[in-house]
Amino acid sequence: MTIGRTILVVADACGVGEAPDAARYGDLGAATVPHVAEAVGGLDMYTCGRLGLGNIVPVEGVPPAAPPRACFGKLAEKSAGKDSTSGHWEMAGVIVDKPFPVFPRGFPRELVQEFERRSGVGVIGNVATSGTEIIQKLGFAHLETKALILYTSADSVFQLAAHERLYPPERLYEICQIARELLQGEYGVGRVIARPFEGEPGNFRRTRNRRDFSLVPPHDTILDLFTKHNLRTVGIGKIGDLFAGRGLTDKVKTENNRDVAGALIQAVEETDYDLIFANFVDFDELHGHRNNAIGFARALEDFDLAMEEVVEEMRPDDMLIITADHGCDPTMTSSTDHTREYVPLLVYGRQLASGIDLGTRETFADIAATIADARGLPHQFPGRSFMKDITP
């Protein structure tokens, strides 16, 4: 059996329960989607429910389907991390054995000085903190001095915030590219992130012009495999940033989940891409990191409506895979960090089997192996394909 198009959808940060090694990451008890459902008294997710979301784990308001329209299971992350880069790379076939470096006390002085020398711009801050908080705290000083606001977090990130009046987004992106070229080896953070903001003192707010500058994957991903076989790929949302553009025929820039949904539905309706890879980021960026369970719940319900349209527009030989890259449990208010969790796995296609329990998978890389097998492409991805399980 050969699949036509694969539609890979990542509900960013939508974990479904603590991973076996959650204690190592300080995440015992995390369960993003189930806890969000509990916090609002239940979710209205008819489409994902019919596909089998409630068959993976108990989710209030989403009962187990009998039988589910999709095959279902959950995946554990094998990579050393709980960030978007390692999560997406792993599902694309690259396991990160060594965690990306983190800098909880800020970046070394000599590194910052070299960045200032190369970029020609000074920095202030250089602390691990919340991005929304630091622009309120240092925004006025930034306007006065024109120094960029540098900060990091519990993730492996080098973030540069700048007011768009002083540094238009394209200029900030140029500076971030300089940082990306510098930050390699022992300082090779997973992502350099441009964080433009606007407003006046006391009312600074981020704009939607964020851009991520990822490391380049060390090995070929499923995207590279497709393009090497002259198959067309498109990345929607932050996919292009996470893979440094590699292996993508086209990229669609979006600002929020609504944009992603529109671009995804259009791609499914109108295009002949062989692999459509989309990331819905709002769960993470707007809700998980801000401990906003109510907003997270509403975003999940909107996501479900988008999935309804995707399912309706799928062609007979399409394969839809819905998953996540990590958790970010907004009910764990002692932290705003990502959480080490299992992620959901829903696999649907009109010509595929339905109602098959795919079990607990050992690595996200099972997705890459399956997508390759679905197109009959030879590969050496570390995952274990479930293509035979979903073939009638």
Model-assigned labels for residue ranges:
Residues M1-P392:
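Feature captures the catalytic ectodomains and active-site-proximal regions of enzymes
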